[in-house]
Swiss-Prot record:
EC number from the UniProt entry: 3.6.1.23
Entry keyword set: Hydrolase, Magnesium, Metal-binding, Nucleotide metabolism
Binding site for substrate: R176, S177, G178, F283, G284
One BP annotation, GO: dUTP metabolic process
Protein name: Deoxyuridine 5'-triphosphate nucleotidohydrolase
Keyword flag rRNA-binding: no
Length: 289
């Protein structure tokens, strides 16, 4: 029996018969692929249960869920808060006017971890602090009314200063899962200068209107270690979009059901809960509202 890797551990449970995990045990990133065909209809987001639940994680470490396929679909890049204990689901959207079938092995899914901070931000009306104590994302509000036309993308400008409070953590914008389940997704982007430019997609067949003050996306203060430097070609990284490359945290994802080392010391039986604890409410991060 080989010794366990000496790094932070994240425990998860996997119960799906529709997906298989393709990453090795104790990998720093969980990868999955579908075992059966998945039908993605036009204009209607497909919410796909993956059979994964995070059982125990570490404070200050969130998760990112990403998907990819060669077919004409768009996978919402999901932010999963460390306190979320519900089943993790991938949101897939059809980019065409016709049914798209993802046959076995054509959908690839990744779940990985990152370090974040939730600093206190003063005099900033557009950001709202995380709803739960373990949440990573600050809600960002629209400055003015927004209209999204069917099957089209729109560029939105947020004319506001960069809310950076420390050089070690950089603000990154993620879309909201609640909007993605309604067909509206936002490109992941680093907030490096002012004004902030967002690219928003409407994959429905309806014109959608959002008033000023609507929660349109989330801002997460991600540790700068996760962004490639000039040495990026010497490390393994993932592209969150065409412009944002990302290193995931060097942790061990441990399957609770197949863990030869499992003990009461390494895996607490029950986590402390209070009113500020997310549990299985919401959709992993920003909720459904």
């Amino acid at each position: 029996m080989t010794l366990r890797k000496q790094r932070q551990e994240i425990y998860y449970e996997f119960t799906s018969s529709s997906f298989e995990i393709t990453s090795p045990p104790e990998s720093s990133k969980i990868t999955l692929t579908n075992l059966y065909p998945i039908l993605v209809r036009p204009y209607v987001p497909a919410v796909i249960p993956l059979g994964i639940r995070i059982i125990y994680g570490n404070k200050g470490q969130g998760f990112i869920l990403a998907g990819s396929s060669q077919k004409k679909v768009f996978c919402h890049t999901g932010l999963i808060d460390p306190g979320y204990r519900g089943e993790i689901k991938l949101i897939v959207l059809n980019t065409t006017k016709y049914n798209v079938t993802l046959f076995a092995g054509e959908l690839r899914v990744s779940l990985f971890s990152f370090f974040f901070s939730t600093p206190i931000i003063y005099d900033y009306d557009l950001l709202n602090r995380p709803q739960y104590s373990d949440d990573a994302g600050y809600d960002l509000y629209l400055q003015e009314d927004l209209m999204l036309f069917p099957q089209a993308s729109t560029t939105v400008t947020i004319d506001s200063r960069v809310p950076t409070t420390t050089k070690f953590f950089k603000p990154v914008v993620f879309g909201r899962s609640g909007l993605a389940t309604r067909g509206v997704v936002v490109d992941v982007v680093k907030w490096t200068h002012s004004p902030l430019t967002l690219k928003i997609y409407n994959f429905t067949d309806n014109t959608l209107r959002y008033s000023a003050g609507t929660r349109i996306c989330q801002v997460v203060f991600v540790h700068r270690r996760h962004f490639p430097s000039k040495l990026k070609h010497f490390f393994t990284y993932i592209n969150l979009n065409s412009k944002t490359s990302f290193y995931w945290a060097n942790v061990s994802f441990v399957d609770c059901q197949n863990d030869a080392y499992r003990s009461l010391v390494t895996l607490p039986c029950q986590e402390d809960t209070d009113r500020g604890y997310r549990g299985d409410s919401g959709f992993g991060s920003s909720g459904m509202r």
